[in-house]
Amino acid sequence: MRKDVKIYLNHILESIELIEEYTKDKTEDDFFTSKFLQDAVIRRIEIIGEAIKNLPMEFREKYNHIPWKEFAEMRDILIRKYFGVDLGLTWEVVKKDIPKLKEEILKIMEELDKNKNNKYNVFAYGELMKKERLLELINRVPKMIEGRVYGYEKFFDETIGYYGARKKEGSYIDGIILLDITDKELGIFDDYEDLDVYYIREKTTAVSEDGRKYDVYIYLRK
């Protein structure tokens, strides 16, 4: 199960700030001649890469202006070349790329803090329809209304033993619209559904029995 993205963002920010601390008032020559400094910086770049790899794909796609892949691969390159590190490249990353990444991470964290009170609607068609499951997961039963989504079908996935949904033109699924789900609760649902492992979360439109339309999230089998 994935952790809250803020945990990984904090890991990235912490490593960036430690790199800044390690290299403060240091020159390129200092870096080239200090094995201790090299090891400390490389280790932090490794941690940044590992944290990036654990960010959900949906999150990375939302902020796709950030070169996540390059930072994650940089970590792999450094590991492969551990006994022959390209010090020039590493120093360039420290002085040029790391400050840019820090700026972007701070912007994202500020945005997440502003959006933490956002509310969402979730279309449930399986376990999340059950009140006892909702109480177990989020300690409350949100307002629920019956609804339908078009262009999808519900099926029993024998590989994992649960119901899933997938796109299918001309089909529909009847279920429950869970209203006013908080950002934290949405994260709990993501974890419960093993987001990015077995399921993806997609925005769509659900229609209630009285014809009202709701923007909802639906979990689809990968």
From Swiss-Prot:
SUPFAM superfamilies in alphabetical order: Gamma-glutamyl cyclotransferase-like
One Gene Ontology molecular-function label: RNA nuclease activity
Annotated keywords: Hydrolase, Nuclease, Nucleotide-binding, Phosphoprotein, Toxin-antitoxin system
Record-listed O-di-AMP-tyrosine modification sites: 82
Its EC number(s): 3.1.-.-
UniProt GO cellular component terms: toxin-antitoxin complex
EC category name: hydrolase
Pfam families in alphabetical order: GGACT, HepT-like
Post-translational modification summary for this protein: Modified by cognate antitoxin MJ0435; probably at least 2 successive AMPylation events occur on Tyr-82.
Residues forming the catalytic site: 75
Sequence motif RX(4)HXY motif, location on chain: 75-82
Protein purpose: Probable toxic component of a putative type VII toxin-antitoxin (TA) system, probably an RNase. Probably neutralized by cognate antitoxin MJ0435. Neutralization may be due to AMPylation by MJ0435.
PANTHER family recorded: RNASE MJ1380-RELATED, UPF0331 PROTEIN MJ0127
Quaternary context: Homodimer, probably forms a complex with cognate antitoxin MJ0435.
Family indicated by similarity: In the N-terminal section; belongs to the HepT RNase toxin family. In the C-terminal section; belongs to the gamma-glutamylcyclotransferase family.
Protein name per Swiss-Prot or TrEMBL: Gamma-glutamylcyclotransferase and putative RNase MJ0434
